[in-house]
């Protein structure tokens, strides 16, 4: 997978982004789903690894089926206006919001991969989706590693229905699209793939393409 990564000079841009994130981090963390991970201190791939492994081993009935979903072209597809309006519901300082929005506009459409502040904004933008997913019947466990979503539940039909509702929410509320390569399958017949690993009820293995990098 090829991505265009943008970098900013340490001074003053990098320092300003660091200061903005430091100021808004406590506010964003309060509303963040506990299994929303990636680019968050203490919540890397290992955090999701432990959650999925534990769920599969300890709750066979509640994890009969898995769903793997991705957001299509996530960073470039994020609406700057929708994002800043969502942020304005949590942060009331207009000068702060104007500064953040100026950085968003400098990305040239969507958010820039490589900007420190954009990692936090991208995670925040899906906060409402995380909350919505956990209200859906049939979704017992959910983890999200930035734009990669893994669901576990007891019923295949309910997961299919949840998948359709999630796609509709993405489009109508966030202006995003779900990748067409989504998958729903029984965990007894196929290992769950997430954060570079493949999980079964009894063991976990490193995905082949990740192993070959070493």
Predicted features by range, described:
Residues 156-214:
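C-terminal polymerase-core module
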Residues 50-146, 150-165, 185-191:
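Conserved polymerase palm-domain catalytic core
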Residues 3-32, 108-135:
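Conserved pre-motif C helix in the palm subdomain of viral-like polymerases
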Residues 30, 135-141, 174-178:
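Surface-exposed helix-capping loop/turn segments at secondary-structure junctions
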Residues 23-31, 87-95, 170-174:
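A generic secondary-structure signal for well-formed alpha-helical elements
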Residues 1, 100-102, 212-214:
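Short, intrinsically disordered, charge-balanced linker/junction segments flanking boundaries
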Residues 17, 21, 25, 41-50, ...:
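Well-ordered mid-protein domain cores that form the structural environment of catalytic cofactors
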